């Protein structure tokens, strides 16, 4: 009898990707976050679709339509809070996924890594445009401040800003186009995820040792499907805990006030997952310099394969690099905290020092540490 799973044109693709996929036998729970990101994307697309059925992309009715969803639509409050907090869960998983990639040297698979960086930019753009849609105070002023940064581009900057706005300020045209892009981008992200997986399955997964594990790979199912189901269950548990008990914990109270172009909030800030980049932007007094630093703070990930100096792939047996890695993580937490603080005296200098150390660790200290560790290992082996 023909094995349908292995011979059917469609099922064969699923089989090679999720069932008979040869997988390293020693990958840890840090490898769970790829599948968790898939769950997050499905949640976001599903809840977003239902929200789009009731939302109106018009400056006069956008805020009241969100209010209507929460008050009058059956389980509208649940769908809205799942979508809003789903973005936070998405970014938590995303940051851990990237952090694991840096720690274990997954960036050596350059095609997979570069598609991942493009995905990060696409997810950040989607989240930013989604934050504008409820048309609260922070939505309006966040959109105004962040889009206005493009005016720092020489010659063409102001024209680009007006072109994005569809006028001379953030208005109805801006909201309509942001809604259109916010709706279409998740489907583009889903397509890019397939490309990401395609490149990953060309090379096979990395593992904690950073060594080739072709000799002893095991099938993905049942070993890692069970592991992914456990991870997915835990994610949904903590996600629903957040949604049902602390739905506004990660939001901004200013966004419960309808947008008013005549009244600026005392402290304009983006969502928590952009605060580290926002802190880097604010730490440079020059507008163009700040924008370049903002873009580079994420684009720097593209250069990781080029500045990898060690003969070892993973940081598992590299204590100096490990120490620098955890300092970098602490540094990012400090930047996130600084981004949420008002522009005042201790915070400015802390932000500037954290920004300098962020770029220094990645571009200078980690490559030097890789060379030193190789020299130490060579010296030790010669003893």
From Swiss-Prot:
Cofactor, how bound (note): Binds 2 heme b groups non-covalently.
Purpose of the protein: Component of the ubiquinol-cytochrome c reductase complex (complex III or cytochrome b-c1 complex) that is part of the mitochondrial respiratory chain. The b-c1 complex mediates electron transfer from ubiquinol to cytochrome c. Contributes to the generation of a proton gradient across the mitochondrial membrane that is then used for ATP synthesis.
Residues where a ubiquinone binds: 201
Subunit structure: The cytochrome bc1 complex contains 11 subunits: 3 respiratory subunits (MT-CYB, CYC1 and UQCRFS1), 2 core proteins (UQCRC1 and UQCRC2) and 6 low-molecular weight proteins (UQCRH/QCR6, UQCRB/QCR7, UQCRQ/QCR8, UQCR10/QCR9, UQCR11/QCR10 and a cleavage product of UQCRFS1). This cytochrome bc1 complex then forms a dimer.
Molecular function terms, GO-annotated: metal ion binding; ubiquinol-cytochrome-c reductase activity
UniProtKB keywords: Electron transport, Heme, Iron, Membrane, Metal-binding, Mitochondrion, Mitochondrion inner membrane, Respiratory chain, Transmembrane, Transmembrane helix, Transport, Ubiquinone
A Pfam family it matches: Cytochrome_B
Presence of the UniProt keyword ATP-binding in the record: no
Protein's UniProt name: Cytochrome b
Family: Belongs to the cytochrome b family.
More info: Heme 1 (or BL or b562) is low-potential and absorbs at about 562 nm, and heme 2 (or BH or b566) is high-potential and absorbs at about 566 nm.
Keyword Nucleotide-binding carried by entry: no
Positions bound to heme b b562: 83, 182
Cellular compartment(s): Mitochondrion inner membrane
Single Gene Ontology BP annotation: mitochondrial electron transport, ubiquinol to cytochrome c
Membrane topology: Multi-pass membrane protein
Organism of derivation: Psammomys vexillaris
A single Gene Ontology CC term: mitochondrial inner membrane
Names of the cofactor(s): heme b
Transmembrane segments: 33-53, 77-98, 113-133, 178-198, 226-246, 288-308, 320-340, 347-367
Residues binding heme b b566, per UniProt: 97, 196
């Amino acid at each position: 009898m023909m094995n349908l799973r292995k011979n059917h044109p469609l099922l064969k693709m699923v089989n090679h990707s999720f069932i008979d996929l040869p997988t390293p036998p020693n990958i840890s729970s840090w490898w769970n976050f790829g599948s968790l990101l898939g769950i997050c994307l499905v949640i976001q697309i599903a809840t977003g679709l239902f929200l789009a059925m009731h939302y109106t992309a018009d400056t006069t009715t956008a805020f009241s339509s969100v209010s209507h969803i929460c008050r009058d639509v059956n389980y509208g409050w649940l769908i809205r809070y799942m979508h809003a907090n789903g973005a936070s869960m998405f970014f938590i998983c995303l940051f851990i996924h990237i952090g694991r990639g840096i720690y274990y040297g997954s960036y050596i698979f350059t095609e997979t890594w570069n598609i991942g960086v493009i995905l990060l930019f696409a997810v950040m753009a989607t989240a930013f445009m989604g934050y504008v849609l409820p048309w609260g105070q922070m939505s309006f002023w966040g959109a105004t401040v962040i889009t206005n940064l493009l005016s720092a581009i020489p010659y063409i900057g102001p024209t680009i800003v007006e072109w994005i706005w569809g006028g001379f300020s953030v208005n109805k045209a801006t909201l309509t186009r942001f809604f259109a892009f916010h709706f279409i981008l998740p489907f583009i992200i889903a397509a890019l995820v397939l490309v990401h997986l395609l490149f990953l399955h060309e090379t096979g997964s990395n593992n904690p040792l950073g060594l080739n594990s072709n000799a002893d790979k095991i099938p993905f199912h049942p070993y890692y499907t069970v592991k992914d189901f456990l991870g997915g269950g835990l994610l949904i548990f903590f996600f629903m805990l957040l949604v049902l008990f602390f739905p506004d914990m990660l939001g901004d109270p200013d966004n419960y006030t309808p947008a008013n172009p005549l009244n600026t909030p005392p402290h304009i800030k983006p969502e928590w997952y952009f605060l580290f980049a926002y802190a880097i932007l604010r730490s440079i007094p020059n507008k163009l310099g700040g924008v370049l630093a903002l873009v580079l703070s994420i684009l720097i990930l593209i250069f990781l394969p080029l500045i990898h100096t060690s003969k070892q792939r993973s940081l598992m047996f590299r204590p100096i690099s490990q120490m620098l890695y955890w300092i970098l993580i602490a540094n990012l937490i400090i930047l996130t905290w600084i981004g949420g603080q008002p522009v005042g005296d201790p915070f400015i200098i802390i932000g500037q020092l954290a920004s300098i150390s962020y770029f220094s660790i990645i571009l200078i200290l980690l490559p030097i540490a890789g060379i030193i560790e190789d020299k130490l290992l060579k010296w030790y082996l010669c003893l």
